[in-house]
Amino acid sequence: MKRIHHFTVFVFCVLACAGAVAQNGTREINYEGLKIIFKKTPKEVVTASLFIKGGTANITEAQQGLEALSLSLALSGGTKTMDKDAFAAQADKLGTSFNATASKDYSRMTMTCLKDNWDKSWAMFADAILNPSLNENEYKVIRDQMVSAAKQQESNPDANLRKLASDQLFGGSDYAKVPNGIPSTLENLKIEDVKKYYAALLGKKKCFLVVVGNVEESSLLNNIKNTLAKLPVGTDPKKPTFKSVTEPTTNIKDRAIATNYILGTLNAPKYFTTDGPLFEFAMSILYDRYFVELRTKRSLSYAPAAFYSKNTIEQPTASLYISTIDPKQSLQVMTDIINDIKKNGFTEKEVKDKKKEYLTDYYMTNEASAFQAGQLGFCEASGNWRMFDEINNKIDLVKTPDLNKTFNKYMKTIDWTYLGKEDKVAKEDFKQLAPSDEKLPVSDLKKTKRQ
């Protein structure tokens, strides 16, 4: 399991004639109805991403994978003026890359290029978006690749565990749908479905553009003028339906596999709220405690994890994860660690040390233009792109008592999912957390010896 920190700096906003400017040079521009978030940097690599809001709210259950397939085909299947091979050859010559990704809340079409090749690369990017060939032969190739990838996901225990947990928590809502599709839905999609869907997808109300790199604003607007500015107004983006953890639940799925996989899911605050960044910070410290107690001291798992998942913007989650041959002891230790924090809180030292690590991570991960574009887009989809520049100030101001209060506020009911040997666990092994105001039992964490 991977942790990805998303960080954001305090912003002073002033109004300029074309849009709002942030202290760090990030600028919001409204150009003929299209929202543009432009961050000028000294980097010689430029990234442009067109975000489409809605995510899985845009598709039905039978259409799972349709948006991802449509965008991938548009960017890699050639255009009406340049076939796939010619398009790929030109991209290689320029050193330009194109890719499309889909998530539960939005999709993204991205181009990354060298500054010197900005104009030519933009022309290709805009041509692919506005005039894709949507060729049937290329469609079949991409669809088959996606079917193969979906089948591999089904056979991967970690991916299977996440799918089981998502179905259990979000079942029947938009967030239960798989953006990249499942084999049965992908195999039933036709080229006509793709053409019809793509023709109605893009519009200024639903889309926004993020550009990060060393290009002039005048060059950017000039390139947009005769391309994306021509997008139709379109329809308002749809808000996804979702569910929350409301009561203790345990789903045990029997599998004859060597290692047992466990995922606990809890409700978490939305990222753009006051509690969001604090809770993410707290979960990062919990991750460290899990690593020490579950891996270093007990060797119960190679990669235990605790993290704040923002993959579902309207209902983020806290995740408790472990793969282990001893699920009983692992479950006990996982909940003991949290109960210990709820009782005694985080220490001043670990909060101070984590601040340094967090901010170092921020500066290192934010060097790439593609990463910055992705995080600016995520923050905009979450409510406000300025959040991207607020994390430094918020983390610097974190006080241990506030962190403990935020952690206790959300560490309540756990939705457990288990994939492994059924005879290794019983329902009662899947513990729930003690209430925050309840006197907790003395932790036995220090007494348990390494196995």
Residue ranges of model-derived segments:
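Short, solvent-exposed loop/turn segments at the edges of secondary structure
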Residues: 43-45, 104-106, 204, 246, ...
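M16/MPP (pitrilysin/insulinase) zinc-metallopeptidase core fold and M16-derived inactive scaffolds
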Residues: 49-112, 285-298
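Bacterial Sec-dependent N-terminal signal peptides
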Residues: 1-24
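N- or domain-start disorder-to-order transition segments that initiate the globular core
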Residues: 22-46
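Short, solvent-exposed loop/turn elements at domain surfaces
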Residues: 37-38, 45-48, 57-60, 273, ...
